[in-house]
Amino acid sequence: MAITKIILQQMVTMDQNSITASKYPKYTVVLSNSISSITAADVTSAIESSKASGPAAKQSEINAKQSELNAKDSENEAEISATSSQQSATQSASSATASANSAKAAKTSETNANNSKNAAKTSETNAASSASSASSFATAAENSARAAKTSETNAGNSAQAADASKTAAANSATAAKTSETNAKKSETAAKTSETNAKTSENKAKEYLDMASELVSPVTQYDWPVGTNNNSVYVKIAKLTDPGAVSCHLTLMITNGGNYGSSYGNIDFVEISARGLNDARGVTSENITKFLSVRRLGSPNLAWDNQLRYGLVEGDGYFEVWCYQRAFIKETRVAVLAQTGRTELYIPEGFVSQDTQPSGFIESLAARIYDQVNKPTKADLGLENAMLVGAFGLGGNGLSYSSVQSNVDLINKLKANGGQYWRAARESGANVDINDHGSGFYSHCGDTHAAINVQYNTGIVKVLATTDRNLASDIVYANTLYGTANKPSKSDVGLGNVTNDAQVKKAGDVMSGDLDIRKETPSIRLKSTQGNAHLWFMNNDGGERGVIWSPPNNGSLGEIHIRAKTSDGTSTGDFIVRHDGRIEAKDAKISYKISSRTAEFSNDDTNTAATNLRVSGKQHTPIMLVRDSDSNVSVGFKLNNMNAKLLGIDIDGDLAFGENPDHKQNSKIVTRKMMDAGFSVAGLMDFTNGFAGPWEAKNISDQELDLNSLMIKKSDPGSIRVYQCVSAGGGNNITNKPSGIGGNFILYVESIRKVGDTDFTNRQRLFGTDLNREFTRYCSNGTWSAWRESVVSGMNQDVSVKSMSVSGRLSGNELSVGGAGVLNGNLGVGGGATSKMPSSDKGIVIGRGSIVREGGEGRLILSSSGGTDRLLQLRPAGATSLDNQVEISCTSASAGDTKISFGQGAAIRCNNAGSPIISAKAGQMIYFRPNGDGISEGQMILSPNGDLVVKGGVNSKEIDVTASQSLPLKETTATTGIGVNFIGDSATECSFGIENTAGGSAVFHNYTRGASNSVTKNNQLLGGYGSRPWLGSTYTEHSNAALHFLGAGDTSATNHGGWIRLLVTPKGKTISDRVPAFRLSDNGDLWLVPDGAMHSDLGLVRSIETLNAAVPRFNAPSIQDGRGLKIVAPQAPEIDLIAPRGSGASAPAIRAMWCDGSLADTTRYIGATQPGSTFYIGASGHDGEKFDSMRGSVAIKSAGGWGPTSTPTQVVLETCESGSISRLPRWGVDHNGTLMPMADNRYNLGWGSGRVKQVYAVNGTINTSDARLKNDVRAMSDPETEAAKAIAKEIGFWTWKEQADMNDIREHCGLTVQRAIEIMESFGLDPFKYGFICYDKWDEHTVVSEYGPANEDGTENPIYKTIPAGDHYSFRLEELNLFIAKGFEARLSAIEDKLGM
């Protein structure tokens, strides 16, 4: 037979670069026919089989190995079982039933072991069969893996059965030896299972070896580290410079990040150390030469949520490290290629650490893009590149023909968006375009513009319009003037002007403006004698002003400027002299005076007069500037005194003194310096103390010995405070208390301070590592050991929250109060806690008696194990023996166990496990199943052996066949006809229907109407219930029942029905039975607890039937069929109880929107549509009917939903008093904006419900649109004067309600009442002005808080009464503008007085 062997290797091309063949697996395929007859399908099928065969065979080997291990475990467990059985024979006893179970479990173990053997044999057979042909390799490997898995499972069952055998054997007493024998059989069977599993493993391994010749799969490992809320650095490889040979490692890493996402990235990591020494090391610039990372996947996944890779260079080598952030788990690594001079530490040899290794240089991942995950311009380094549009932006334009009009052209352009274009008009059409001229079109917002350039002249035409005008067939056209299209005289309004190279105008009066346009224009006034004037006149010839210059001479030249009022008044000229001097009677300089020196010498003898006064609105009316890096000062000098200088030094600090160098003068302490902190060389004495934060010295991250922190005689101060503010900040701090790393505060306190060698200190340290306080003392430089602090009481009692005792704890009494915890064992009366079993907790007394708790919470009492071997319980008192209960045993390891009662009765269990119950001699033994004091049904065993049974003796089982009859006992405990099956099982008496043929087992209630009529609406058709025993009889009806009822009269077209569940509340009788659960015929679920509805309404199952029973209820019946209905008094609730467990409690009421329908055969489901709404609302009864919702919280879809966009908004809706319309009031939009749902309508807060504080980044934006306001009027004189007066009242105040608080902050402003008084004093009505506000309210009651819930679980609101009251308020922004106008008036008046 011809054999063909083909070797194939996968090829991949990425980014136009060939990938080396060594990265991808080879497949060796053997086909059982000649090369000439091989088809492509044969090759494909063989490759797929080979690819699957290798992993399957490998899995078969793994499963078989696991089967062997499980069988070995089974053997070990069987050995343990045998040992336990031996111990059982000498230690304890149990029931015969337990022994039988043990034997059965051992038998199960044997059976499972045989199953394991058979499964292993199956694995062997499948493995052998899989070698028969290459085309069946994959299937055979899968079967082998499955069979080996079965072997593993059965072996596991064997181990479990052996474990059951061990447990049962431990409890066995009567048949301990039998258990040992059965366990031995289990051991033998498990050994057989191990042998068979080993055979299966060998066969699978043999098959794997054969399959590995055909398949060479990629080696894949688990990433060695998984992170939770921590991050680590992991060393995964080391590569050494190979010189001229190869050194290469290629890895494919998957699932390396993207926590919480349903998809991830694949990282291809290329590593090579070749050329390392030539490159003279690894840098951030050349790292990609040695470590290159290509990432395939969605760019939407954050780059910092993935594995990141880098190198740490050594001498001739480098290590490869990965930074693994939090919550990266279950990552896989495939080795695509590996040469020599490489060391891979995966899966073994890796190193992980929390801190970044020294010298770590990261190589950023380069992304591989595909058709779905496309790069952005930024990814390609083309942020500023222009995108080429569909119609020529950056490319070629479009051409349009047969354009009929300007409107037609714009519509054509609009259809294709912004573009380059050219067009040709239809013959005879009136279109403002240059035929075949190129142009540009833009559409921005609702505006359009088209520019068209004639190709042979350059003449430009422009078309413009808006969407509204375009819809009305309006387009504006314009032809631009230029050198190729010059305007005529008439085009520019000069049709009547003669143009002969200049404009000529006769006469010396011009009616228009005169413009002089040249590089250096000028007007010359040439005076032959006298003054030269430039006059400014009124139309009537009256003078407004003049600029004139009198004749000059050798010593004087002047220019005068004069202005006059309308009545000809002028009180002074402004004169500019030739020497630069200016003269003015009253000068006002509005901006700046520049001068070398200025001196003001006031000869006024009035000492209260002012030499210089500077006023204005500027925040810096005087600025002293020195063109130097040195000091600048203001001087003060009196006679017979050196000048005092106030100024700033070169550091900008404010100082005062006599030295020109302010560095030598005293600094002035400013608020900024106080806030920032400053040093004081001398001792500061705070007579009244000080308040505010006390900042400790930060010693974090310092190398420091706490022993060095002392206060000696020469050291200033009595207390010093130090703080380590981080967990790692104390790594280099020594002599801390044990267990303290960082995060602590240390107080050093001076107690004695006689000299530098005669002093006493104390150190107190508080740390969060242990949440403890520690103290130690220093005497003359020698420190005592650290001790944990405790609290002492007046009577020397010690009360601690938690205390660890390493030695002995002595004293007369130990009290652990409240919920206190004693974490450890306790020895009492000399008891040694070392006798306590290591895993238990308890009390050891005296010679060894123990009260302890076992590992599963069992309470265990044990004596000291002496010769008495007794436990005595004395309920009547410590010395009362008559009522004691005594537990004893005859041997420490076997023998009898006995419970003796003080009255003489006893219960004993012998060594074989049989219980013996004995009474005092001559007394009887009573068995009372109905209770200690109830003799009914009792059984009595007399001293002579008689057995008296007060009841029937029933057989264990009754088999009813066709030849037998089962009598039924008639019951009188019910109305009507009733029969009972009588049973006496303490566990269960059941009645059932058994179907052994595969069909259903159903119990039906068949009901007819009277006289063979149809059943009626709400007729009880059947039910099931429970009737408890009352002591002498059963209840007349069920205390809990399930009823089936008809919905409407039955007919050929109506088979309607509904269900109700009736219960009787605790403490009530069946006459108070409540139909608490009703499942209506329309699918509604009604929950009606006790007291919610009268018993007359027991048949209500819908809104429709409730309206009929209670006409005034009058609720909309359209609510029927919509789901859950809960009727309860006061406070119906839906309680979502969600124990947290190991996750997070997150109960939810969730609406699930979608398009489509599940009600028809299409079953189409589509994306959520805009406007889908989820309401949480309330409706009420208006006295006539229930109406629709009048208040709601509505969650809405703000737009259509898709995979990348699911916008929602939340809207709060209410109905105001006096209205029946529900309106949306406030909403949170899809972008998070809190917005009122109507403009200029809703307030935040009111007079007696004010918002305490509003935090914002920017100020509020208030509408001030001129289109919405009347004209702004000027303020009257009284208003201006009132504004000035109000400004003078501004000061600081505090809230009266904060009078008893510390650290009260002062607020700046004034009261409304004072502002009202001032305005009224100027004859103004304050309440005509918007900045004066007044609100009042009537007395009303509100809920202030909710107390503990009522006994019935309803809410417990606590009300308070808000008394009638009122508030005065300001609109501060308007008040500030009002006051600002007063400031402006004052400043203007000052400027006028200064002549400015």
From Swiss-Prot:
GO terms for cellular component: virus tail, fiber. It is an enzyme of class 3 (hydrolase). It is found in: Virion. PROSITE patterns: ICA (PS51688). Pfam families: Peptidase_S74 (PF13884). InterPro entries: S74_ICA, WH-like_DNA-bd_sf. The record marks S1264, D1265 as: Cleavage. Keywords: Coiled coil, Host-virus interaction, Hydrolase, Late protein, Protease, Serine protease, Viral attachment to host adhesion receptor, Viral attachment to host cell, Viral tail fiber protein, Viral tail protein, Virion, Virus entry into host cell. Its main location: virion. The keyword Lyase does not apply. Residues 187-214, 1263-1396 form a coiled coil. Residues 60-69, 189-199 have a biased composition (Polar residues). The cleaved C-terminus functions as an intramolecular chaperone and is removed by an autoproteolytic process after correct trimerization and folding. The keyword Hydrolase applies. Residues 51-133, 145-203 are annotated as: Disordered. GO terms for biological process: adhesion receptor-mediated virion attachment to host cell; lipopolysaccharide-mediated virion attachment to host cell; proteolysis; symbiont entry into host cell. Its EC number is 3.4.21.-. It comes from the Viruses. Homotrimer. Interacts with the O-antigens of host lipopolysaccharides. This is Side tail fiber protein pb1. The lineage of its organism: Viruses, Duplodnaviria, Heunggongvirae, Uroviricota, Caudoviricetes.
